From Swiss-Prot:
The keyword Coiled coil does not apply. SUPFAM superfamilies: Thioesterase/thiol ester dehydrase-isomerase, Winged helix' DNA-binding domain. This is Transcription factor FapR. One of its GO terms (biological process) is fatty acid biosynthetic process. InterPro entries: HotDog_dom_sf, Thioestr_dom, Transcription_factor_FapR, WH-like_DNA-bd_sf, WH_DNA-bd_sf. The gene is fapR. It holds the Pfam family 4HBT. It comes from Thermoanaerobacter pseudethanolicus (strain ATCC 33223 / 39E).
Amino acid sequence: MAVRMSKVERQRLLKEKINTNPFYTDDELAEMFGVSVQTIRLDRMELGIPEVRERIKSVAEENYQKVRTITGTEVVGELIDLELGKRGISIFEPTEDMVFVKTKIVKGQYIYSQAESLAMSVIDASAALIGVANIKYKFPVKVGDRLVAKAEVIRQRGNKYFVWVKIKVKDKEVFRGKFILVAIDEDFLKKRSDTVEVSN
């Protein structure tokens, strides 16, 4: 028979866990501690810890300020980590209006949009376009799935950035993309020309 920990000890460990990873859901925490979701919610309320959506939103707001190529509102999902020119992480939870009616599977355009906007966010340029996208959808996604996208700038050659994006639901990779982004010159933006040369 397992020994139950005291409420004080559980709350201390809960606070520690959330400080280490603010993105744990109440369900995940309940499973970790072997208690009900209701118990975790009560513990969080007593400790003054907001729910996961609020914690994610708070972290994301700080990261939106760092993005140069697009505005924070154009990022699909919540930008929870960003090291400009190197890497980034976003979390996205598709809603009911994003699925095919018959199958209830999330439309690929939303998954791609998360990957594309994260790739655009991680590069250190004031403006850019996708020059090439090599993508692969590996498994279907449903409403309720939490998509965690990780982007990494693999290399930069002149005005081209090579970015890999992988999206997972829990530990299963559902999408993979290799993007070549082309940084747009500041002078070009000032001229407002109609054509951009995107070559490989």
